[in-house]
UniProtKB/Swiss-Prot annotation:
Catalytic EC class: hydrolase
Name the UniProt record assigns to this protein: Tubulin alpha-4 chain
Subunit structure: Dimer of alpha and beta chains. A typical microtubule is a hollow water-filled tube with an outer diameter of 25 nm and an inner diameter of 15 nM. Alpha-beta heterodimers associate head-to-tail to form protofilaments running lengthwise along the microtubule wall with the beta-tubulin subunit facing the microtubule plus end conferring a structural polarity. Microtubules usually have 13 protofilaments but different protofilament numbers can be found in some organisms and specialized cells.
Function description: Tubulin is the major constituent of microtubules, a cylinder consisting of laterally associated linear protofilaments composed of alpha- and beta-tubulin heterodimers. Microtubules grow by the addition of GTP-tubulin dimers to the microtubule end, where a stabilizing cap forms. Below the cap, tubulin dimers are in GDP-bound state, owing to GTPase activity of alpha-tubulin.
Length: 450
């Protein structure tokens, strides 16, 4: 079996996690108490869904997941929510006092008291696997727990499970919408360890997803639930090939192989199509070509950065539902002929496709329409550098005045760590600039863009 363990850290990680597990349960027909009427083999079978759920002797399906937060309120919602019977109580780990939006508290003072407990639980889950494939880590880098405890856990996972791949789904601060003043500090400090300790990181950004909800689903005032349900569709499409059988299955390690040209260049953009409300879906014919095109639309990207400002290095298209390889090849051929979508000149093929016959499931009473086919795209584009340069700029404005730094130093950090992390990000921006540059120097003369 190729099991995956999901780790949800901090409020954002947990709330995205709730949406994901709700969707997985619906997709597999698992009830909120963990029973699965369709599953005839009692005890651990080697059905495809066992990559994400372990099975007890009593026929109950338990998610291979850990939820961690430094304060109890968000986890208490899981403990009392609709899916409270799904999770083993030991999988929900909460502390007493929160990280107060402070990376240093999450990483040093308060985080380190809880991290061994987390690793202990993760070890139990790992021992329960026959062939652990890797970890999916969900967190946000703007707050204190997601950034601080998140990077601490990633560092420790690298030590304990060196060869296992780690996929991060990371919520980055948005350009306009901010939830805390010290977001730029937390993000820069946290990205420093995301660079070292994740193999692929998918960037998400609330503002971009808000816009998608407003524009495509006509939700005037999207809530986090709306956002998370959209994100969960992306994550579900990525992991569908691990949980169902399909024509072209894609493994977690395959993402790495196909998307990451150099170890540091591993920050991905994601998009999903069709995002369409039920009223509209009746009147649209959502062919493979159409949904493929809309996945490449700059407005479909789930992070605020414009792929037209950069070049694609590779992209992974995961189709699900009523899709045949012939249609996919035709759609990809059309994309390649489009001048608007530019690839770097050293990567001629650039596409990895996966097809899964399980049609997309929607949450009843949710916003998305039930459709026959959908596509999720994960792409590695040099335009991701925009996200980093934006955060770096905000970081510099505060750090030149050393504003708020005493809160971090007071929790046992050294000022050198700030400049070290900042230099690391500056180097990352440079790396992106270099991979996007023409390999035959300056024959086209379009270096002015950067």
């Amino acid at each position: 079996m190729r099991e995956c363990i999901s780790i949800h850290i901090g409020q954002a990680g947990i709330q995205v996690g709730n949406a994901c597990w709700e969707l997985y349960c619906l997709e597999h027909g698992i009830q909120p108490d963990g029973q699965m009427p369709s599953d005839k083999t009692v005890g651990g079978g080697d059905d495809a869904f066992n990559t994400f759920f372990s099975e007890t002797g009593a026929g109950k399906h338990v998610p291979r997941a850990v939820f961690v937060d430094l304060e109890p309120t968000v986890i208490d919602e899981v403990r009392t929510g609709a899916y409270r019977q799904l999770f083993h109580p030991e999988q929900l780990i909460s502390g007493k006092e929160d990280a107060a939006n402070n990376f240093a508290r999450g990483h040093y003072t308060i985080g380190k008291e809880i991290v061994d407990l987390c690793l202990d639980r993760i070890r139990k889950l790992a021992d329960n696997c026959t062939g652990l494939q890797g970890f999916l880590v969900f967190n946000a880098v703007g707050g204190g727990t997601g950034s601080g405890l998140g990077s601490l856990l990633l560092e420790r996972l690298s030590v304990d499970y060196g060869k296992k791949s780690k996929l991060g789904f990371t919520v980055y601060p948005s350009p306009q919408v901010s939830t805390s003043v010290v977001e730029p500090y937390n993000s820069v400090l946290s990205t420093h360890s995301l660079l070292e300790h994740t193999d692929v990181a998918v960037l998400l950004d609330n503002e971009a997803i808000y816009d998608i909800c407003r524009r495509s689903l006509d939700i005037e005032r999207p809530t986090y639930t709306n956002l998370n349900r959209l994100v969960s569709q992306v994550i579900s499409s990525l992991t569908a090939s691990l949980r169902f059988d399909g024509a072209l299955n894609v493994d977690v390690t395959e993402f790495q192989t196909n998307l990451v040209p150099y170890p540091r260049i591993h920050f991905m953009l994601s998009s999903y199509a069709p995002v369409i409300s039920a009223e509209k879906a009746y009147h649209e014919q959502l062919s493979v070509a159409e949904i493929t095109n809309s996945a490449f639309e700059p407005s479909s990207m789930m992070a605020k950065c414009d792929p037209r400002h950069g070049k694609y290095m590779a992209c992974c298209l995961m189709y699900r539902g009523d899709v045949v390889p012939k249609d996919v090849n035709a759609a990809v051929a059309t994309i390649k002929t489009k001048r608007t979508i530019q690839f770097v000149d050293w990567c001629p093929t650039g596409f990895k496709c996966g097809i899964n016959y399980q049609p997309p499931t929607v949450v009843p009473g949710g916003d998305l329409a039930k459709v026959q086919r959908a596509v999720c795209m994960i792409s590695n584009s040099t335009s991701v550098a925009e996200v980093f340069s934006r955060i770096d700029h905000k970081f510099d404005l505060m750090y030149t005045k050393r504003a708020f730094v005493h809160w971090y130093v007071g929790e046992g950090m050294e000022e050198g760590e700030f400049s070290e992390a900042r230099e690391d990000l500056a180097a990352l921006e440079k790396d992106y600039e270099e991979v996007g540059a023409e390999s035959g120097e300056g024959d086209e003369g379009d270096e002015e863009e950067y």
